Amino acid sequence: MSSSDLVAASIQGNLDEQISQLMQCKPLSEPDVRALCEKAKEILAEESNVQPVKSPVTICGDIHGQFHDLAELFRIGGQCPDTNYLFMGDYVDRGYYSVETVTLLVALKVRYPQRLTILRGNHESRQITQVYGFYDECLRKYGNANVWKTFTDLFDYFPLTALVESEIFCLHGGLSPSIETLDNVRSFDRVQEVPHEGAMCDLLWSDPDDCCGWGMSPRGAGYTFGQDISEQFHQTNNLKLIARAHQLVMEGYNWSHEQKVVTIFSAPNYCYRCGNMASILEVDDCRGHTFIQFDPAPRRGEPDVTRRTPDYFL
C-alpha cells in the first residue's frame, strides 16, 4: 500500500469514527468540524447548480435539527451508503439538534460523495440562522460562534437544485419568474449568501399556489406560482415532476398542480408540536416512485432552551 493510500485509509477510518460518534448525537470538536467542512467545500465546489442524480434515490424534505427523526428516517429508508439520498435543504433551525444534524449530513457527504446529495434550503443562510436557532445553538454547544461561521461559509457551496434522471427537478422552494430553463440556473454564481430577491432567492423561497400565474409570497421573499407556470416549466425543460420541500404538509407529502409538483416534508411533529407525519420519496431503478410516511422517533430528554425562537410561516 502506498503512502497516499495509507493517508486515504486513515482519513476514511477517522471519518467513520466521526460518523459513529455523530450517530450517537454527540457533536464533533471545533477543529474536527473545521477540517470536515474544508473537505466538504472541495467536494461541493465541483457540483453543479443543477446537480445530476441517478436513480435509485430517496428524496427527503426539511429536517430542521430534529436529529432523532433523521436517525428514524435512516432506519426506515436504509442507512447510507446502502441507500442513495437527496436532501432538499433546511437541516438547521427550530429543532434542538441542528449542530449534530448538519454535521452528520456533511460527514456522510464527505465519506460517500456519490451516494448523498445535499441541496441548500432557505435556512442555510447567515441571516436566517441568527434568528431561528442555529446560531444560538452553536454558542451554547461550543461557547463561541466559530462553528456557526464555518457552516454558514460552507452553505454557500451547497448546490441549489438537482435533476434526477433528467426528469425530476428537485429544489427547496420553487420556481422563479427570472428562470425559464435549467441552463438559466446552471449559469449563475451560487457561492454567496442567499440574496433578498432574484432567481437564487426564489429557488429557495417560492411556493406552489392554487391561483394562476405569479403572486406575491406571504413569506416576504420568493413568489407563489400557479399550475400554468409549472406546466410551462415542465414543457420547456422536458420534466416529469418538480419535487420540493419548504412547506409543512400534514401527511408528509402533498401533490399539487395535477401531480406536476410534490411537496415533501421530513420533520415529523414539526417543532415538536405540529402533529404532522413525515415522508420520504423513493425513486426506483425504473423511475417508479413510492412515498414512505413515518411518525416521530420517541422523544428524548430535551435540552433547556430558554430563548423561544420567533414564529414565521411554518
Curated annotation (Swiss-Prot):
Keyword Cytoplasm: yes
Calcium recorded as keyword: no
Cofactors demanded by this protein: Mn(2+)
Gene, per the UniProt record: NPP5
Pfam families (UniProt xref): Metallophos (PF00149)
Identification of the protein by name: Serine/threonine-protein phosphatase PP2A-5 catalytic subunit
Binding residue positions for Mn(2+) 1: 62, 64, 90
GO molecular function: metal ion binding; protein serine/threonine phosphatase activity
Organism (species): Nicotiana tabacum (Common tobacco)
Predominant subcellular localization, coarse grouping: cytoplasm
Residues noted as binding Mn(2+) 2 in the record, renumbered to the chain: 90, 122, 172, 246
Family statement drawn from the similarity comment of this UniProt entry: Belongs to the PPP phosphatase family. PP-2A subfamily.
GO terms under cellular component: cytosol; nucleus
Co-factor binding comment: Binds 2 manganese ions per subunit.
